[in-house]
């Protein structure tokens, strides 16, 4: 992808831009706060009326006093139950909080290089039947402070929808404490062993689909890139892949976590925390960072929601809090690798680092990749989920020439956690991904947007219809990145500063910190972490709360809730809304100030001090030729325009006759499958992966040399038998009423006529032999003629 070169922006202009954005952010925050407070005044009758209190109001007041006193006791008792659950969960070893029963398959703690990971098989619930020959699903949850289980938190979850569709489901879990010396490279190796085991258990099934949630997403991509032959399609949900990306504009401040690495001085704080933990990093730090993103929810809303719905809300609250309070640990080597290579350095996918001596090259992945992100996600904004595609492939042509299929699905407003735990998202987006994954494998190489439309049937039932729209990488990258990614330049300064600070810490402070730290001090520090104290203090272990349980039982026996229409409950809700609005106002101002400080420091001051620092965007621009046809991968395909055989000829013909710019409804793939089965005798026996590779090269040829692509078709069909076979297939397809129902465009008719004329004329020139044996004759190829129906 070509990055437009511009003259460097003067520091004063950058400062002016920072000031403009800050001013706009503050105005938006103020306006949002004013509207919320004004809405409270309009919705509360007592705010607009006044009068002498009546007997009715005094009655309501007494009822409200009884109700609020009872709710207070029940609220405190729920927090006590949360504390008891926390201690029970800790005593049980903090097991995974999967809603489903599971069986251990492989425990990596017993591997030659042990890690605290394991593979479990999800036991289908009663009434759910699973077909062992269907594609298995392997779900990887994020190891980001919490324990595993978010992908299978309830029936309406990723696990639930895959089981409901009849697929075997496996889950990658992990244990609270890491094995001594384990690294992320070791974890990647263990996950490879897990996938091989799944394939061994399902020899008649397609390769397993790998589903990665959040940080489990980049783990899934590392797994697939390090051993591309063992995995099926990859689905990554809310997964940060391009860590410098974000939405910097004059609108709302959506991505505050994007700037925290720079404002905290880089990676050295993670090393310090791990050293204070005696070589172990406490995941509670990560959870705390997550909580501070939304102080209104962390400090008030979730507790008021419990208090206001105390008769119905406790079970849901306690279920979520059991997972929220299950904190897991990492080795220092693991957290340092993550922070230095991913969050701050953003250099894993550039080929600067890898595992077991092998660099991670995402272009090695040959199976389709599905990216699911949300505009409402302020932890993994769409830019972070998508920009890696532009960095790794550079252009639409390279995606096609490499035979890759990438599908993007974008939700409008669900938050980060909602991507994984929302029942609505599970029943719609996740369920449809499972349903159409086989069809995604049949897509021609390219970049696609997945669209899910809701349609109501005559009976009022909601059904989902899926279609795919081919997109251009260059257009999508421009839409998501409003400043052509120039706002990522300050992160290069952050990376340089982080390296300096890390070395300074390792030289000047680390030896002392490590000498003063021991297992006892580390454990005391963990137990006194505010996130743990929040969970543990309110429990039966606290002797000052001995009265709470019996009193709560008495309150439940004599519960007298006040009416929801009570003016005092309305006043309570109004006060709560004002408190929430104030905390949101504080958050917006805090985030705006942090953003301004970040860009002023690393976008203005650092470039002035280090003007010769190389720019990643300039490096990318130099690496990508201005003419897409000159890209090495595309050039290789064009140079082989006269090379190939029957499979290449069919793929080229399909490319030449394909409809351009139209959505691809799911029904079209179902028809392709039917046609492929019926005309199997005229199709080459190719696996879908092999067909995509061939189709991708032919796409590049047809895109850049359409006339030569037609003229050289006879060279791919050197024998009269192959030419006759190809023409027979074309004529039979055109005569099929299911195909002719879709009227050909004038361009298609003209192209078809040229193909007929060229093939009818024939050619005595033999096809040039490729360097390797034709892919259709390889013994290891898995016949899948349906794929040839592209």
Predicted regions, residues:
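Short beta-strand/loop motif that positions the catalytic acidic residue
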Residues: 365, 371-373, 377
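C-terminal catalytic histidine-bearing segment of alpha/beta-hydrolase fold enzymes
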Residues: 401-477
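Conserved acidic catalytic loop of the alpha/beta-hydrolase fold
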Residues: 177-182, 189-208
